[in-house]
Amino acid sequence: MALYWCTDDIMETYNDEPYATEIPPADKKYLPMASGHSITTALGFLEVADVIVGHNIIGFDIPIIKKFYPWFTPSGLVVDTLLLSRLYHPNLLDIDKKHGLNHMPLQLYGRHSLESYGYRLGEYKGNFAKTTDWKKWSQEMQDYCVQDVVVTNKLCQHFHPYLNGSR
């Protein structure tokens, strides 16, 4: 089960494939603001998902979720694209230099961050995270979080051939 969007406080599945290669249809909307109920519902879906994918999900996201929701225990496979990046691209600086990514800031060369991958994959994340204290919801925050999902999905697609043995 791959969870990509929610409408009317109900998480919907877009694709039952663990490595979906499509972005949700444009007519599907993310909730403008999460309520405690929708967060608990979403975490319930994540607990029973066959696969959960995130960038630094093992080192950051899951520990933060457990801090606020101690009962949260994913039962499926957890795929961390940060770990995959470090495993399959240990020479990322050389790769970046070889490709000459003129649009990517030099300080991001060789980094395994989601921001760096946003540039590499043509899905720029934006500057919101650098300009906010994250204390109050805003549409900019929502858009930034949605873009995080888009970049992570594209990064997962990048690593899929490595994981299924076709690369």
Model-predicted regions and their roles:
Residues 7-39, 51-165:
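Active-site-proximal helix-loop-helix substrate-binding element of RNase H-like nuclease domains
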Residues 1-5:
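Short beta-strand scaffold segments in enzyme catalytic cores
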Residues 46-47:
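A short, aliphatic-rich alpha-helical micro-motif
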